[in-house]
Structure formats: C-alpha cells, structure tokens
Amino acid sequence: MSLGLLGNKIGMTQIFDESGNIIPVTILKVGPCVITQVKTDLNDGYNAIQIGYGTVSNKSLTQPELGHLQKSNIQPLKYLKEFRVNNPEEFKVGQVVNVESLSTGQFIDVTGKSSGKGFSGLQKRHNFTRGPMTHGSKNHRAPGSIGMGTTPGRVLPGKKMAGQLGNKVTKTKKLKIIQVNGNENILVVKGSVPGKPGNLVTIHVSN
C-alpha cells in the first residue's frame, strides 16, 4: 500500500473541459500532512508511516497525544492516521507530504464518513418495494415478515430492517484527478466523495 493523504471536503461544483462538456467535480483541501512516526518491521513488527493533519492548540489534545508529538518535535495536530508501506526507509519524521505527490489524470480512492440521514424505513434504506396503496390495503410501507416461526425462533443476523441510514465510513473508488493546485493544496476530482463539506477524507492512489 502507498502512503495516503488527509484532507477536508470543500464542496461540489462543475467545470467545462476543452470540448465544452460539463464535468461534475468535488474540491478537496488536502494537506499539508506531516510524517509523525516511521514504523519498521524490525522495531514494530510491520512497516507503516503515521501522518498528522490539521494544526490545533495544545489544550485540544490529551497528554499522551501531546507527548507523542513532542517526542518528535512536531507541533500539535488534530488528526493522526497510519498507512502501511513497503519502503519505510524512504520517509523520515517531520517530512511534509502534500498534493504535489499526485498528478492530473491519476485515479484515487477517497474514504470518508457518509452524510447521516437519521432513522429511515425500508424503502429509503434498503430500496424495498412498497405494498399496494389502495383497494383496502393497510400494508403500505410495512416491513412484512422478518423470519420463520418456532424454528429457528429468532430473527437471523443481518436481516434488513429499518434503522439509521448513513453516518458510516465509506469509500468511493477510481475518481479521476482533474486538477492539482500545489500553491493552495487543492485537489479537484471528477464525481462525488462521501460526506458533507468540511468532513475529513482520506486519499489513496487507486490500485
């Protein structure tokens, strides 16, 4: 796995390409991220790089978090995330990584928390078909049967039922990079990414 990046979703808009076609795009504020720890197979049992993102004040962190960063002489950072890599010797603590490691035309995977939509029924949450609306039917949006009888005498795990929709970590794959702005640390990608504007997102180069 390659080293990823952290950033925030700014929002969606649309741009025109050279042929005049409209392309829906999402604008992401990515990095700069700081490498806070380098883990090796020899010392830690596996190879990984930990990066930090988002400057905050000292009082925003717990003492263990603050001590972890101060040990490497790194300013307080709001988010820490670890990425498995094959070549940790190529990185060093304090190194800054940003959008300049990406290029136009590349494909990336973006992970974030989807927008929460609250308690939702089966039609909205699982795309169930509703019952008849007329002719005396009282089964409009009811779930119907949720299992068998005395045997097994329980509702089987994983049964699709009403409940909270959204607010889960999800990934959108193979998003094409339309534009990279290294000066402003802005990434413009084709399509949508999970979550609302301001949400934290993780960016990986697609396999």
From Swiss-Prot:
A GO BP annotation: translation
Cystine residue pairs: none
Compartment(s) of residence: Plastid, Chloroplast
GO CC entries: chloroplast; cytosolic large ribosomal subunit
Keywords from the named record: Chloroplast, Plastid, Ribonucleoprotein, Ribosomal protein, RNA-binding, rRNA-binding
Primary location class: plastid
Chloroplast recorded as keyword: yes
Domain of life: Eukaryota
One Pfam family it belongs to: Ribosomal_L3
GO molecular function: rRNA binding; structural constituent of ribosome
Keyword Electron transport annotated: no
Annotated segments matching region Disordered: 128-148
Role according to the record: One of the primary rRNA binding proteins, it binds directly near the 3'-end of the 23S rRNA, where it nucleates assembly of the 50S subunit.
Subunit structure: Part of the 50S ribosomal subunit.
NCBIfam families, per the entry: L3_bact (TIGR03625)
Family the entry assigns: Belongs to the universal ribosomal protein uL3 family.
HAMAP family tied to this protein: Ribosomal_uL3_B
Protein name: Large ribosomal subunit protein uL3c
Organism: Trieres chinensis (Marine centric diatom)
